[in-house]
């Protein structure tokens, strides 16, 4: 016997279904469910008097026979490929299936088998996303990693050795010894990690030894001298080893202008950091490279989005990060040349057009690593308010815009850095790095963070209380963040050459090493999902006005942002 219920009651019980719309936190962004993989009347739900009980929604199938380890029930998946309702299965630390969970002995349409060995995470009324990937990390202090994880970031790539002055300014881990010690420390942290070696050298030998020592990328930074010779050499070595190169170009234009840097690229693929320029790069026109087919451009989050306070905070921030002295006129001029309201405003619009492909933090070095996800959605909301719906959206929802923006901190950095076969999206066969959100807290405060199939972090109440919810509630590491579970549920990225050379044995690393691949000629701007636009970008050297395909790109700074103070009163 079947029974009809209202859509609102159904959504309360099992979460939204096809055609239902959901607001993302306090933004103006609205998503609409495109498809529901569950079966009406056969939904599975855990709890007293609910469906997932022996002989009902739970079968007798063993895990060895095909039952899954964990099922996230009735979740609303938001990913670059779609916005759909489904049950999500996890098995052996991987995403096993996306579909309909239950007991195939008595239920129709079951594609995910629940057995006695299956645990349940309730996803009803929740949004499920892939874990975030921050590809611009200054490893200044280990405490960063917990802050990033609690925000929903499960993968971090960058360079540094701790609070050295080289690390304060540059995302580079220099030399085999430092790389080895940093990689050994990574066994302590429940996230995927990768090291970028220093790429500033005019001859290949020093770069080769860093890659073979474990670097999964090389970073060219102006503070170490990003000359055309260093650029050319670094890209040549990267081509030989199939690793990515990230670049922070020459703000002072000492060794050449943006055209000289582009010439040194020789059409080769490169990841351009803070492409707008406030974080560093040829003044005032580094933003031009966002229109090139071989450049994979990203932003760092302090300029995201452009607000009434953005300019004021940047000058002091820059002086500290780059070891400058405000009493020296040349240092002050260097700082002021980088902070331009015109290019920061254009950055907002280039993100909305899909010309800027990725978002990152620049952690503690002109960036806030716990705010990559929040600032991505603040930018999307600001653009919705100022520019209206995108042409690809119907007007009733913002599905395409949401897919464009979520790709900026999930799948696109994974593609850029050669790890998209393992992470970056909610897809079958990938590592189960997943984040569950309540819609009202989307992009700000996750409900649960799953790493390699195991809950690794979550908000938790008083451990001495009789139930999990009494105040004070804090984000805390969970069992997946300890002991052997930690090292079994995350990886360290490196080059194939490092693995072939027996690096794990040499360093005694417990985490699995994962080789990056397809980072060079096999990818280009066209590989950046929903963010592959290549407009012709021009910058007026006198006014700093930015035009894309002849159109002036400008917008007002935001006076008020969503996902801000109302979420952080305590």
Swiss-Prot record:
EC top class named in words: hydrolase
Modified residues annotated as N6-carboxylysine in this record: 219
SUPFAM superfamilies per the UniProt record, alphabetical: Composite domain of metallo-dependent hydrolases, Metallo-dependent hydrolases
PROSITE patterns (UniProt xref): UREASE_1, UREASE_2, UREASE_3
Domain Urease: 131-570
Binding site for Ni(2+) 1: 136, 138, 219, 362
Record note on cofactor: Binds 2 nickel ions per subunit.
Cofactor list: Ni cation
Swiss-Prot/TrEMBL GO biological process terms: urea catabolic process
Record: active site: 322
Binding locations of substrate: 221
InterPro entries documented for this protein: Amidohydro-rel (IPR006680), Metal-dep_hydrolase_composite (IPR011059), Metal_Hydrolase (IPR032466), Urease_alpha_N_dom (IPR011612), Urease_alpha_subunit (IPR050112), Urease_AS (IPR017950), Urease_asu (IPR005848), Urease_asu_c (IPR017951)
Compartments, record wording: Cytoplasm
Stated family: Belongs to the metallo-dependent hydrolases superfamily. Urease alpha subunit family.
Subunit structure: Heterotrimer of UreA (gamma), UreB (beta) and UreC (alpha) subunits. Three heterotrimers associate to form the active enzyme.
Database matches in PANTHER family: UREASE (PTHR43440:SF1)
Name of the protein this chain belongs to: Urease subunit alpha
Source organism phylogeny: Bacteria, Pseudomonadati, Pseudomonadota, Alphaproteobacteria, Hyphomicrobiales
Gene: ureC
């Amino acid at each position: 016997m079947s029974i009809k219920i209202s859509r609102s009651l159904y959504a309360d019980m099992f979460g939204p279904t096809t055609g239902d719309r959901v607001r993302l936190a306090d933004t103006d962004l609205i998503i609409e469910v495109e498809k529901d993989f569950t079966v009406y009347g056969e939904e599975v739900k855990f709890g007293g008097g609910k469906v997932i009980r022996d002989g009902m929604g739970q079968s007798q199938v063993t895990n060895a026979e095909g039952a899954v380890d964990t099922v996230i029930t009735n979740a609303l998946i938001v990913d670059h490929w779609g916005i759909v309702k489904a049950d999500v299965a996890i098995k052996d630390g991987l995403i096993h299936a996306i579909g309909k969970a239950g007991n195939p002995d008595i239920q129709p349409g079951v594609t995910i088998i629940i057995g006695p060995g299956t645990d349940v995470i309730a996803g009803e009324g929740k949004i499920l996303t892939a874990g975030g990937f921050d590809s611009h990390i200054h490893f200044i202090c280990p405490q960063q990693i917990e802050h990033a994880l609690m925000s929903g970031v499960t993968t971090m790539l960058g360079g540094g050795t701790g609070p050295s002055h080289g690390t304060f300014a540059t995302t580079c881990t220099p030399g085999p010894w430092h790389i080895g010690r940093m990689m050994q420390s990574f066994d302590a942290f429940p996230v995927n990690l990768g090291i970028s070696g220093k790429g500033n050298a005019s001859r290949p030998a020093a770069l080769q030894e860093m890659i073979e020592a474990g670097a999964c990328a090389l970073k060219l930074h102006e503070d170490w001298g990003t000359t055309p010779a260093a650029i050319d050499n670094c890209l040549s070595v990267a081509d030989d080893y199939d690793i990515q190169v990230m670049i922070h170009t020459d703000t002072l234009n000492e060794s050449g202008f943006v055209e000289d840097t582009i010439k040194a690229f020789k059409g080769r693929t490169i990841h351009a950091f803070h492409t707008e320029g406030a974080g560093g790069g040829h003044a005032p026109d580094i933003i031009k490279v966002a229109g090139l087919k071989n450049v994979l451009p990203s932003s760092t989050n302090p300029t995201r989005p452009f607000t009434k306070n953005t300019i004021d905070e940047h000058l002091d921030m820059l002086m500290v990060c780059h070891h400058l002295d405000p009493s020296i006129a040349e240092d002050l001029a260097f700082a002021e040349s980088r902070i331009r309201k015109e290019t920061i405003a254009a950055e907002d619009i280039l993100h909305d057009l899909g010309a800027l492909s990725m978002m990152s933090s620049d952690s503690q070095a002109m960036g806030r690593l716990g705010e990559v996800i929040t600032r991505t959605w603040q930018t999307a909301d600001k653009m919705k308010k100022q520019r209206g719906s995108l042409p690809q959206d119907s007007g009733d929802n913002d599905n395409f815009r949401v897919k464009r923006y979520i790709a900026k901190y999930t799948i696109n950095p994974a593609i850029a850095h050669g790890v998209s076969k393992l992470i970056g999206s909610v897809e079958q066969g990938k590592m189960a790095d997943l984040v569950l959100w309540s819609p009202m807290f989307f992009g700000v405060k996750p409900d649960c963070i799953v790493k390699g199939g195991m809950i690794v972090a979550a908000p938790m109440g008083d451990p001495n209380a009789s139930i999990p919810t009494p105040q004070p509630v804090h984000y805390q590491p969970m069992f997946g963040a300890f002991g052997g579970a930690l090292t079994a549920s995350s990886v360290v990225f490196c080059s194939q050459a490092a693995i072939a050379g027996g690096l794990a044995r040499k360093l005694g690393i417990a985490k699995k090493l994962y080789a990056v691949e397809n980072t060079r000629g096999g990818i280009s701007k066209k590989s950046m999902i929903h963010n592959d636009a290549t407009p012709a970008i021009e910058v007026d050297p006198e006014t700093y006005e930015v035009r894309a395909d002849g159109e002036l790109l400008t917008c007002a700074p935001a006076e008020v942002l969503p996902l801000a103070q109302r979420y952080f009163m305590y």
